[in-house]
């Protein structure tokens, strides 16, 4: 999709554009006698030509009848209508992707970002904890805990424009369906964002202003949980062990040895993390954001990150590398409140997981969340919405289909159905209807099933 810059193929014109012709001179033909056939032979030749013409016409009618049918000869108008719809749809999609809007003519042009100015997400707030405490006391109908559990808001999203690859929109829909299922079953609120709240922080960085805005607009929420659109819940039963994080404000998947010993750029993964709604988190976002503005600032910051972090390719600054750099370079300021989680897969890299789903089904059960039955399968590098990816498109799409159906089977089980296979959208019945349906609710309802978790080291 998109413009590739290749020239359009046009029919040649001018001296070389027509069909080849032969110019006959006055003496042309065989010995100059081309038009001197006897009258009888001329009439016979004309009659033969007429017969050939009639025969060709008859054959043409037979061919048309065999391919489109006589009754379908009138379908050309319907085809024209369909073609017009396709062209109109493509035109609208092109306009949406172009960023042009005639209603924005009166809006002033945004100036370029000053590379010498430190970027800020918004007005500096220094007393958020006290402001939030007062608000919660004044609004008891919006408690920060529900049924004894801290209130969580899951934030995810995708770009405001249609995907470059049309099938990407289909997998975005499957991804949000998967997240809605998990949140519905675990009493978690969900926000799906498709807006760039700050044009300077597009791409990887778009999550930061949205997280901050949700914190300030929903003081009743205790945790904001960011999750990339290309990450799927694959253990629908598993629950975040929030009690483990009472003294922490950031929960992120990673490995301390890769972080502190190797300074690896993949020591942490920002595709799925939890951030507590508190002053500490606002301060972290303020410290995290300055590398994010697009343009020279992001480009120069990328060079710093590549030089500092092991294994990082040379490209513009991304939010994950910037967070790792911040936690390493200001360890005393931040790390006391950061929980680097690897007891379960808050982020699970897809390549080592998707081909083992059948083995997991045979040996284990949902609710484990770790390598035995991964909580989250994250399709890093697949970019189903983009026009390019780091892995083969077919491999990515088949793997995403397997992950979605693996998770969906856990949801469908309550209703007595399952996918026919991990690559099949079709479903089959796995148990018969009964006059006592509530026994299946008690047996299969995910909300009633106890969860096994690993002990903390």
Swiss-Prot record:
Recite the UniProt keywords alphabetically: Glycoprotein, Glycosyltransferase, Golgi apparatus, Membrane, Signal-anchor, Transferase, Transmembrane, Transmembrane helix
Q: According to its record, what are the GO cellular component terms? A: endosome; Golgi apparatus; Golgi membrane; Golgi trans cisterna; trans-Golgi network
Question: Membrane-spanning regions, if any?
Answer: 52-72
- A Pfam family that this protein carries is Glyco_transf_34
Q: By its UniProt entry, which InterPro entries does this protein fall under? A: Glyco_trans_34, Nucleotide-diphossugar_trans
Bias kind Gly residues: ranges: 26-37
**What GO MF annotations does this protein's record show?**
xyloglucan 6-xylosyltransferase activity
- Coiled-coil annotated residue ranges, if any: none
The family database entries (PANTHER family) matched by this protein are listed as: XYLOGLUCAN 6-XYLOSYLTRANSFERASE 5-RELATED, XYLOGLUCAN 6-XYLOSYLTRANSFERASE 5-RELATED-RELATED
Q: Which named protein is this?
A: Probable xyloglucan 6-xylosyltransferase 5
Q: Which organism is it from?
A: Arabidopsis thaliana (Mouse-ear cress)
Q: What is the lineage of its organism?
A: Eukaryota, Viridiplantae, Streptophyta, Embryophyta, Tracheophyta
